[in-house]
């Protein structure tokens, strides 16, 4: 989702973590308000809600860009974090302030909740991954995708040849937020099982930004490569440090962060395009 916005449309955002939270909390509300509604439909609806929210926060992109747009999306990140904490209706007035996925069935299989199996949840996420990748590939190759890339490369020239910045930029924010919202719902209800507002903080926004930068802007395949590097390499470093050298887990936690940052710097120097 972030690569669609940043890599193809050239609009930077530091609010990815918060928009994932919008998707997660929206899905939670759909499941609690409509308990008989299929959870997969709730996930898609949460993506649509996030697309609408993303389009609203994308309005500043019509007047500003670059560093100033980054600051505007950072403000959206902090505002949404505040909303997740200060609006109890979003988490059904739970004392913990968190949201938790209930057990839901599909075709006789429990696909979410504490009683679901990890393999079942994996196949649900894999199905969404394949379908959304196919959709993104087709949209990017179409008229909408070409308008995003023209706005990214030279917005004034794009406007002169008939591309409307209003439509192109807001559609990029909406489409990107749709993907981010679905990923937030899948993360909470098909992986973590439960989450609090800390799961959607600014640190996660930076983490997703690093994935896109490492993988390469404007590359769908690069998104997956960047995600693998950011997620898998720290795990490997921790395991090697504990098993081979006997280092403490706390030491390896901090060492993995340092090495990941060093790796990002090296990749940006050697391969600036990812």
Regions found by a protein language model. Give the residues of each.
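Transmembrane alpha-helices and adjacent helix-loop boundaries
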Residues: 1-274
């Amino acid at each position: 989702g972030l690569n669609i916005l940043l890599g193809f449309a050239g609009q930077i955002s530091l609010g990815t973590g918060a928009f994932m939270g919008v998707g997660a909390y929206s899905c939670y509300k759909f499941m609690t308000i409509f308990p008989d509604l299929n959870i997969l439909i709730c996930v898609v609806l949460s993506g649509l809600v996030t697309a609408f929210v993303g389009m609203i926060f994308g309005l500043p992109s019509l007047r500003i860009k670059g560093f100033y747009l980054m600051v505007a999306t950072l403000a959206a990140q902090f505002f949404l974090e505040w909303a997740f904490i200060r609006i109890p209706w979003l988490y059904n007035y739970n004392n913990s302030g968190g949201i938790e996925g209930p057990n839901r069935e599909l075709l006789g299989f429990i696909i979410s909740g504490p009683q679901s199996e990890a393999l079942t949840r994996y196949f649900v996420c894999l199905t969404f991954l394949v379908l959304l990748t196919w959709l993104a590939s087709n949209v990017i190759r179409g008229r909408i995708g070409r308008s995003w890339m023209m706005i990214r490369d030279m917005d004034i020239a794009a406007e002169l040849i008939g591309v409307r910045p209003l439509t192109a930029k807001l559609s990029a924010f909406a489409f990107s937020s749709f993907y981010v919202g679905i990923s937030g719902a899948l993360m909470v209800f098909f992986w973590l099982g439960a989450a609090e507002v800390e799961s959607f903080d600014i640190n996660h926004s930076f983490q997703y930004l690093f994935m896109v930068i490492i993988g390469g802007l404007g590359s769908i395949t690069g998104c997956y490569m960047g995600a693998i590097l950011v997620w898998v390499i720290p795990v490997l470093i921790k395991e090697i440090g504990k098993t081979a050298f006997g280092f403490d887990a706390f030491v390896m936690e901090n060492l993995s962060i340092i090495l990941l940052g060093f790796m990002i710097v090296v990749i940006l120097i050697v391969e600036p395009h990812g």
